[in-house]
Amino acid sequence: WKDDIKIDQEAVKAYVGGEFKPNAGAHAGRDWGKFDIEAEVVGLCPTGCMTYESGTLSIDNKNCTRCMHCINTMPRALKIGDERGASILVGAKAPVLDGAQMGSLLIPFIAAEEPFDEVKEVIENIWEWWMEEGKNRERLGETMKRVGFQKLLEVTGTKAVPQHVSEPRHNPYIFFKEEEVPGGWSRDISDYRKRHMR
């Protein structure tokens, strides 16, 4: 989904009050104690985008990575948004010796509605690029590593977003072009450093 997570504050209060079992009752075989929303939901959010203050749960949807932990823990209180679609990952493989390798996120969100023309257009662009750039018996993921992921982003017309970074601050594959940099390559670096002194 693309839009905000829907929150039912009454159901949140019911979870905190013990009326509803967390995880839809999946852990009901044993007494785990009183449900602690701070420890079991807010504290386990990977981006820290949730807060629970004075009986109200709020989510900073801009920073949410949609891991779905909160939704799985409180399914009656939290629901996914209405604008639904798909993410497209490319370049995955499962070789016997190395084990399965996850694909790279290419399209964070695309509307997946019949007749799926938007999805087909992206896939056809990838196929054309792969047929032109790929070597004999070379997989898409190997072509992406050899030519560069940024080239695939350009071919599909996808703008780089933070979700494309798999390892922050570790050899980025997104490089800026001169027209994207304010002042271009010819700006005075000493002037820039004056404005950004530590």
UniProtKB/Swiss-Prot annotation:
It comes from the Bacteria. The keyword NAD does not apply. Residues 55-83 form the 4Fe-4S ferredoxin-type domain. [4Fe-4S] cluster binds at C45, C64, C67, C70. One of its GO terms (molecular function) is metal ion binding. Keywords: 4Fe-4S, Iron, Iron-sulfur, Metal-binding. The keyword Electron transport does not apply. InterPro entries: 4Fe4S_Fe-S-bd, NO2/SO3_Rdtase_4Fe4S_dom, NO2/SO3_Rdtase_4Fe4S_sf. Pfam families: NIR_SIR. Heterohexamer of two alpha, two beta and two gamma subunits. Part of the complex that catalyzes the reduction of sulfite to sulfide. The alpha and beta subunits may have arisen by gene duplication. They both bind 2 iron-sulfur clusters, but the alpha subunit seems to be catalytically inactive, due to substitutions along the putative substrate access channel, and because it binds sirohydrochlorin (the dematallated form of siroheme) instead of siroheme. This is Sulfite reductase, dissimilatory-type subunit alpha.
